[in-house]
């Protein structure tokens, strides 16, 4: 009845907007014409059943998709977007497609397979080894009606499926479910689980509905198995939430076993599961082990390929799962696969891995036993459940338990009869009875107090014993003295009273003698006492009485020794064993005779004048050490005898080191000095002597093999000579070289490699240390990946619970690793020491410092050596940063025990720690520049003082140093990036360093923030983190916190500047970028732990649905991957942050919808639309064309209607198509000012710029993501400005190059044709100078300013009302602005000079008269920057005044000139010219060096002419060297260096060089000799006797008379000649001096008194500087620069250190302004060589 049939193709064309929307959702684009072509003509040829009218059958669509996606030449890549869109319409149909979509039936197995009868219901499902039996539902549904009720419609296209109907299911016995309701009229078998879920949302749940499970293979309602594949989410979760097979095969095997039991996968599903969860190598290993497990008919593993392939096929089998046999095959396959997983998961036997399983500090014994059993299963072939292995498992359980549990288990009675369960129960008891941390801390405190009490009691006992012993010794001493005094008073030699003949000498009784005295003790006779009672045993110096006055205590070899000052002793004497003795000996003559004694080796002695090395006589028999005349001389001692005794003072009259102490305190002098951080009196040094560098010597890592350093491919040896080294530096590093040679770290060698050795002076001292320059070696050695920990996040592994620390710094760490002999030659260097007999090369046998791979190699070696320590002490935290170790424990006792174990381990391994830098068992330590205390890290005061002590930066380098030092502390400064924003631009190269108020404010704010820096908590990886983020003006700020009770403790303050692209976004999107940036930075500290993000914006919704207009696909993907990782990143509620602390405020802020705000901020003009306006005044079409024609790119732009051209213009050659499109669209908008306009463009670029990108560009400052300016910047700005000119505007995009008769197609073709025609239009040869009559250079667009009208009135022009313009000489007058734009454009094309451009303009015809043409053209040519940099310029500098001496010999000019060919090695001529007289001295030389200059100056000039006052030279190396300048300073000579590349500055000597060379050339031609050295005296004679500017020769000026030219052979003639006497000759010289020298000096001085200003440049002017050495296509001038200082002939400019002659600069702006009223003020600076100039108004 007139109705047309609806087909899928026609349906899609009628709803084409929805089709395009669907395509956009698939990220593709489709065209209607190609859509029809592919559907009706292309796809039917694929022979897959595609109808010409299209179809929504998913099977047919899939077949077409396979054809389209076929790889190689048979594929159709151009059809991919269209078939993808077809598929999307069929899979997710819109309402108008649903009636035509075929219902997707469940996947059934082949119908030929017999279906299984339904199994009877069972109360308990039968057991199976792999999966439970499948049962049919207990109650089946009734057979539904085929036709609906007669009262209803035949079919509801919106709710029902179209015919054909699905087959009905089996009838239910009663037709009702449990609820008694009639089953629904759904006749098909059970639908797919997904349909069931969707239906469940729309329909109420049925009480008796059977639960559907999404298993790959399940039994359907019709008795047939249905297939449902794995979902991608399941595979993703299994993959990411389980360890890899190589890491933990047991866990992954259990997972796969559970999947096989519950999901009943098919063969294909098993392959998909293995491919997802296993790597390729793991999968092959599992399949191989599974095939090995196939058994034959005899029940043993078979090797028959047929049986193996039947049971476990590698290719897809043809099993029918609807048959019992097919299911049995599948069951067998799963069993074999599970066996393969179990066999492949067994690792090779490794008992060390089992031994490495130890019980954790808080791990229960049961959990530890499970881990131990799992290790047995994984790393051994033994089954831990086997009773035969119970003994081994039990012993491992005991030995590897926690130390306290293991010790108690070992002491159990009847241990051998205990079972493993008994041991676990005992261990649980011990574990549960452990003391709590509080109890442990109390016990440790109590033990410490008891220990301290015992120590105090022992000290008191020792003190009492020492006092008692002292009183006893003093009593004996006093008794001896009194007895001696009594005997002296009695006189004589009587020793004792006379005895009777029968009197005992012992008891004084009579009747027996002394030998029979009963009172005399019996026993062996003791040694006879010494005669001197005042001399105590002084071996070792313990308890020795100090020598009598005068005495001095000096340090000898690091130990204090008290000497008796003995001026009679020629040599100083030591009495104690000083160590090794030398082979020298000396004969010592004393009062009782002579004896030979040996000398000691050199000992370092600390004197008042410094350290000296001295050799002593070792005389053990001497009562006291003697300070002889040898050391007294070095000490420069002075001895004064006064009433109180002799006084020994130093050279300055100050007392020397004199020490007076009691005898009982003398032992303190001999104690070994300890580092300041090691507790005084501790036993750490004595208990672990091998662990300290002070007691153990140089270390050697005994477990590390010698290192081999691999070279890069094709590397050759490099040999660099040793730099010159001063004597002081050589003597400073000599002891270090000697020490390393003695220790074997340096050895002599001969190597083709050689690098220089640099002596580096230690700051604040006069000591030197050797540093080798290994940069060239580093370039030739292979790079290795650096594995040194990052100090930024190293402390993240330190939990806050560990608050007792020990810090050790390994000394000479790199020297602990040996170098292989084949690699030792790489690090050779030169060293000469005649005293040691060394003259050649030395090299390192250990890993040297300065080698680029040394930190990484040592860090890895120490990590390997300390691995066992970490395993044995799991409750301790050991952090290592190269050679800095930090040990942390929870209690002081654990820290002490751990420190002892660590020191013992380091000593055994061969490493040495520095005792001076050790911090042992403290609650507050310094590590890596941080202060660790109470689980927090602080900035050290030294770090703060370093930043606070820096002065205000004056240069970019100083500012970079400040920012680098302060940037280390940025974690403590909230908003550091925003705070330092004004400072960073000044650090860029080429930027003028201008320190203003903003920079000073930022500088002070950073310092103030450091003073108030808070304490940051150490990251606790067991707790989640919270990140509070804020953003302000393109700067991201945040604080990372963790919960500490009810408070949030800051962990780090983060801040960063957003990139230019993100900084131009709206605030909500900037917050997304800020969160992404700070989340990445926070990940370095959180180490992958959960992170909760809190911000003032609803960021999660923006990330999930980002606006595509602002974000690129790459950036969107990056943000989503980073922020939508729900396992690691979560978003908290919206909070309002405090700008000072970045923490949330208690009150809630104003809420907003970010998506709404972004929707409002997407465009430039709010009413701009892309739909045609119904009441538009104009409908125009724009197009731009750019194409190549005859090798030249031509371009044009046009604005048209459907039938006529509105505007068309040819654009300059090389214009791109995008730029042409922008110009055309902009022109259309300008012409439609104040009107309603519909404008069509086929340019996506122009359309997107107007609608979307223009606003984005404006916000980001017209910069790209790299911070560079975007292309077509001027055109984009013009377009954005022109958007607001029309009253109403609609910019519509239309496809380009359309065919058809629609209005859009006709208009687009018209615009395209017009643009191409105007671009290809032929123009005359002078087209570049002709002006087109088209807009905008038409009379209608002329706008005359007030100034133009005044100039036209003066010119005599008239105003033409008809033409509405001014007319002069019969031509319309072009306004001044138009003239400037035209001439500037012409100059940019040609860059011709003023005169040539003017000549071309006068020769060519122009329809307009250009107002002020010559003046404008001159201004343009003179201000062109490119011309100023390239064009040559004549010097306008007038001749200056030369400074000359006031008498001969005071002012000389010196220069070297090269004379070729050089005979006998003489190639240079050193020329001296006296500026006063012009006298010349020239000396042939072989080298052009400073040594030659100083030699001739001191040996030739000074003896003959006296010491010069001024020397003038150029900037040659021989004159600017340190040697020449030092000699000049010592002699008091003012050495002036002339301007570079300005030979006129040394004009007098340069002219003399030319004169001498010309004369030598003439003499060589005349004589035929090439020996110019022989002819040089004749050339000098000519130069000295040539008249100068004043008519006098240099000889006459110097000597007052002409030289004698003729000798008269006739004696009579000689008598006639004038022969004045000596007196007369002297009078003549005096007259010459008055008549010649004074007038000459006055003439020179007059020139200086009235100097002519040779150049007009002033301080503050801007000038260009000549580039003397230009490269290819490089400008001739550089700059511009600002003038800082001036002299009459030279300038000093900002950015160039050397003075520049005025002839080498030109003004950047030739208009020299008149002098202003400003004045300059000179201020003194801290640097005596610098001044500060400031300008102020007068």
UniProtKB/Swiss-Prot annotation:
Residues 430-435 are annotated as: Interaction with host UBE2I. Residues 741-932 form the Reverse transcriptase domain. The gene is pol. Residues 111-218, 434-499, 513-552 are annotated as: Disordered. The modification Phosphoserine is found at residue 192. The keyword Metal-binding applies. Residues 345-393 are annotated as: Interaction with host PIAS4. PANTHER family: GAG_P30 DOMAIN-CONTAINING PROTEIN (PTHR33166). Residues 1174-1320 form the RNase H type-1 domain. Keywords: Aspartyl protease, Capsid protein, Coiled coil, DNA integration, DNA recombination, DNA-binding, DNA-directed DNA polymerase, Endonuclease, Eukaryotic host gene expression shutoff by virus, Eukaryotic host translation shutoff by virus, Host cell membrane, Host cytoplasm, Host endosome, Host gene expression shutoff by virus, Host membrane, Host-virus interaction, Hydrolase, Lipoprotein, Magnesium, Membrane, Metal-binding, Multifunctional enzyme, Myristate, Nuclease, Nucleotidyltransferase, Phosphoprotein, Protease, RNA suppression of termination, RNA-binding, RNA-directed DNA polymerase, Transferase, Ubl conjugation, Viral genome integration, Viral matrix protein, Viral nucleoprotein, Virion, Virus entry into host cell, Zinc, Zinc-finger. InterPro entries: Aspartic_peptidase_AS, DNA/RNA_pol_sf, G_retro_matrix, G_retro_matrix_sf, Gag-pol_Znf-H3C2, Gag_p12, Gag_P30, Integrase_cat-core. It holds the Pfam family zf-H3C2. Residues 1444-1602 form the Integrase catalytic domain. Mg(2+) 2 binds at residues 1183, 1221, 1242, 1312. GO terms for cellular component: host cell late endosome membrane; host cell plasma membrane; host multivesicular body; membrane; viral nucleocapsid. Residues 561-631 form the Peptidase A2 domain. Its EC number is 3.4.23.-, 2.7.7.49, 2.7.7.7, 3.1.26.4. Mg(2+) 1 binds at residues 809, 883-884. This is Gag-Pol polyprotein. Residues 434-466, 486-499 have a biased composition (Basic and acidic residues). The active site is at 566 (protease). It comes from Friend murine leukemia virus (isolate PVC-211) (FrMLV). One of its GO terms (molecular function) is zinc ion binding. The record marks 131-132, 215-216, 478-479, 534-535, 659-660, 1330-1331 as: Cleavage. A motif (PTAP/PSAP motif) lies at residues 111-114.
